[in-house]
Design a protein with these regions (language model features):
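Active-site neighborhood of HAD-like aspartate-dependent phosphohydrolases
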Residues: 1-50
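Short histidine/acidic/glycine/proline-rich micro-motifs that form metal-
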Residues: 15-17, 54-56, 127-131
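Short, electropositive alpha-helical surface patch
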Residues: 63-68, 136-137, 141-142
Length: 143
């Protein structure tokens, strides 16, 4: 008989309780307010992000999701990745952290993961690969 060596958890909504609609509303609202001083118009910015996200979900594997997102974002906004990527990275390191306020907390999550690791299991977290890694790492810490 084969022994299980890995345990798979869903991050969003399981280890990190959240109402997806509330989270997206808060996140996009804060992102739009943060980017407004740099000349971004809220509706255009949000449309560019949704369209870029859609492009990632349709990715055929010929490029990374990140490359696919930025190519789409550049077409819609007329802005170059090289000039904007650092600005967005800074947002995810600072402003995005405020989105933790609309996430819940499951006190059993961290304890369960810790106990499984102590027993020698590999713990794998599943999430849609649609956020930049800095945002995914933040959501893991929040859980």
């Amino acid at each position: 008989m084969r022994k299980n060596t890995a345990i798979l958890f869903d991050l969003d909504g399981t280890l990190l309780p959240m109402d997806q609609d509330e989270f997206v509303k808060y996140y996009f609202g804060y992102l739009a307010r943060t980017m407004e001083p740099y000349g971004y118009e809220k509706d255009n910015l949000i449309a560019a992000i949704w369209t870029g996200t859609g492009a990632m979900t349709g990715n055929d594997g010929t490029c990374t999701n990140e490359e696919r997102f930025w190519k789409t974002f550049e077409k819609i906004t007329g802005r170059r990745r090289e000039g904007e990527e650092e600005r967005f990275y800074q947002f995810y390191q600072t402003g995005f952290q405020k989105a933790k306020a609309v996430c819940g907390y499951n006190p059993l999550a961290a304890d369960t993961v810790r106990k499984l690791k102590e027993k020698g299991y590999q713990v794998v977290l599943a999430t849609n690969p649609l956020f930049p890694s800095v945002a995914t790492e933040s959501r893991i810490r929040w859980a």
